[in-house]
Amino acid sequence: ELAAVVHGTTIATNAVLERKGARCGLITTRGFRDILELGRRTRPNNYGMTGSFEPLIDRELRLEVSERLDARGRILLPLDEDEVRTALKTLHELGAEAVVIHFLHAYANPVHEQRAAEIARTNWPTGFISISSDILREVREFERGSTAAVNAYVQPVLSSYLSRISDRLQEAGFGHDLLVMQGNGGTLTAPAAARQPVQTVMSGPAAGAVAAAHIGQQSGFDNLIACDMGGTSFDVSVIVGATPSLSAEKDL
């Protein structure tokens, strides 16, 4: 009898790499709709006007509302709830399947994001709502916003996939939790993965690195270069002292 099923998947990773995710909308602080394009100082090419970066959310689907917090989380301008409702209606009419709520300085105080999410839960038909302060409660609005955008982009795809897998396991008589690999090499339950699918991005290669470290150690090799090749990408990990290397950031 199976006690656990741990599933490593490239569904979320492939959706991002192949640009086959959901059509998403963004509701953000007035004046900051272009933060996903502005990003940081890094550019595709350092010189000239060549190179491009196409955010996962089209500009027409990035809408602004009135609200503002300072860096300490103090309210400077209250959230305009009517503007949130109007933005949700507009995004739905434009065909958005998932929505991101991303306000400036929400890492310090998520009150406006939480209130906007409450409004969205009664006005957004699909239920796919990504709140940036829930996904990545850290300083730096670009990193927080882009991570939340990835979450929304892959959520409908991964949720549907995990639902099918869970149903098949139940039909087969499996009564325990389905565990899904995370990009950090750990696991989370299928419902948690459906809520925050961004945690599963690069989980397939991460699982490969963990497995390679284990197999290498069992075989007497603590220092390895592990390669993971599939139909979409070729991933390489360096394992030193039987331990995979870790990073707090990932660019795709």
Where are each of the predicted segments found?
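N-terminally biased helix-coil "hinge/interface" segments that flank
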Residues: 1-252
